[in-house]
Amino acid sequence: MRLIPAVDLKSGKAVRLYEGDPARETPYGDPVEAALRFQEEGATLLHLVDLDRALGTGENREVVRRVAASLSIPFQLAGGIRSLEALQEALSLGASRAVVGTVAVKDPGLLARMLEAVGPDRLAVALDARGLEVVVSGWQEAVSASALDLLRAWAEMGVRTLLYTDVRRDGTLLGLDREVVARVRAAWPYELIVGGGIASPEDLHLLQALGVDGALVGKALYEGRIRLKEASWRS
């Protein structure tokens, strides 16, 4: 299982939001320094999120460029990618893969065109949810769509990488909801990356036991609760 550090960008800084709430952020300084530190500690992939684009409050294009120029490892880019043009821009900024969420829920036709344009290796889908209650538009809008029905539809469309985040737990260090993660794993037959609440090596062991392919970790890395250099969770 791959451990993937998450660097969220807001107003040019690396931050973590508590339960996805933009009013409850913890700043962690220069995102380039954070990205380089994670790379030096052994990360093989970085998850970069432009929160301002996701929330419609601005963008961090230049910061993304700086991060891309500083890294020798690949990164995936998420946040506000809601058009073919935005998708192409994300990849042109250096991302090895773009991640879409709102589009995948609200506009399956556009998702299909995106998949056709760049292929499933360069496009992942994010399922952001409070448990299994799906949320979109920077986690600010709940929708009635069934999470498990969406998973089936995306698999049939050709999506091959899913990022599931439990927004209730994101940035809280409260640990995982084992039952929900198990249900998502059972419903999704392809690559699954999970985030939201991961707080300790025990959470990583749990994900590994459930057959999850990757763990998105943010606050626990910043706070030193999990260290990339330590391999104990892999055993």
Swiss-Prot record:
<dbReference type="GO" id="GO:0000105">
    <property type="term" value="P:L-histidine biosynthetic process"/>
</dbReference>
<protein>
    <recommendedName>
        <fullName>1-(5-phosphoribosyl)-5-[(5-phosphoribosylamino)methylideneamino] imidazole-4-carboxamide isomerase</fullName>
        <ecNumber>5.3.1.16</ecNumber>
    </recommendedName>
</protein>
<keyword id="KW-0963">Cytoplasm</keyword>
<dbReference type="InterPro" id="IPR006063">
    <property type="entry name" value="HisA_bact_arch"/>
</dbReference>
<dbReference type="Pfam" id="PF00977">
    <property type="entry name" value="His_biosynth"/>
</dbReference>
<comment type="similarity">
    <text>Belongs to the HisA/HisF family.</text>
</comment>
<dbReference type="GO" id="GO:0000162">
    <property type="term" value="P:L-tryptophan biosynthetic process"/>
</dbReference>
<feature type="active site" description="Proton acceptor">
    <location>
        <position position="8"/>
    </location>
</feature>
<dbReference type="GO" id="GO:0003949">
    <property type="term" value="F:1-(5-phosphoribosyl)-5-[(5-phosphoribosylamino)methylideneamino]imidazole-4-carboxamide isomerase activity"/>
</dbReference>
<dbReference type="InterPro" id="IPR011060">
    <property type="entry name" value="RibuloseP-bd_barrel"/>
</dbReference>
<keyword id="KW-0368">Histidine biosynthesis</keyword>
<comment type="pathway">
    <text>Amino-acid biosynthesis; L-histidine biosynthesis; L-histidine from 5-phospho-alpha-D-ribose 1-diphosphate: step 4/9.</text>
</comment>
<dbReference type="InterPro" id="IPR013785">
    <property type="entry name" value="Aldolase_TIM"/>
</dbReference>
<dbReference type="GO" id="GO:0005737">
    <property type="term" value="C:cytoplasm"/>
</dbReference>
<feature type="active site" description="Proton donor">
    <location>
        <position position="128"/>
    </location>
</feature>
<keyword id="KW-0413">Isomerase</keyword>
<dbReference type="InterPro" id="IPR023016">
    <property type="entry name" value="Isoase_HisA-like_bact"/>
</dbReference>
<dbReference type="InterPro" id="IPR044524">
    <property type="entry name" value="Isoase_HisA-like"/>
</dbReference>
<keyword id="KW-0028">Amino-acid biosynthesis</keyword>
<dbReference type="InterPro" id="IPR006062">
    <property type="entry name" value="His_biosynth"/>
</dbReference>
